[in-house]
C-alpha cells in the first residue's frame, strides 16, 4: 500500500506535506503534487500536514491516482520536492472545487 495525492491538490498545491516526508517521495508538477508509490514507506506522517485533506491511503477506488503519479514521474519527468513553497496564487479559490483533475489536467 502507498499514499496518494488526490483531486483536492489540483490547482492548490499546498506543500506543507513535503517537509515531513522521511523518504522525500513527493514530486511536483505545475498544478499539483504526487507521491511516488515505489518510494513511499506508508508511514502516513504527511497526511495530517495537508491542509485540504488531499493525501489518502491507497484503496481500490483510488488506484487511478497511483497510475497518474507513475505517469507524471516517469513520462513527464516531474522532480522531487523537499522544501515547502507557497501554495498556488488562487489556491483558496479552487480548494473546494470538485473534479479538478479532469477539468484542468485531464491526462
Swiss-Prot record:
Binds 1 [4Fe-4S] cluster. The keyword Transport applies. [4Fe-4S] cluster binds at residues 21, 40, 43, 46. Its cofactor is [4Fe-4S] cluster; [3Fe-4S] cluster. The keyword Nucleus does not apply. Keywords: 3Fe-4S, 4Fe-4S, Electron transport, Iron, Iron-sulfur, Metal-binding, Repeat, Transport. One of its GO terms (molecular function) is metal ion binding. [3Fe-4S] cluster binds at residues 9, 17, 50. It comes from the Bacteria. Residues 2-30, 31-60 form the 4Fe-4S ferredoxin-type domain. Pfam families: DUF3470, Fer4. InterPro entries: 4Fe4S_Fe-S-bd, 4Fe4S_Fe_S_CS, 7Fe_ferredoxin, Fd_C, FdxA, RnfB_subfamily. NCBIfam families: FdxA_Protbact. Ferredoxins are iron-sulfur proteins that transfer electrons in a wide variety of metabolic reactions. This is Ferredoxin. It comes from Rickettsia bellii (strain RML369-C). The gene is fdxA.
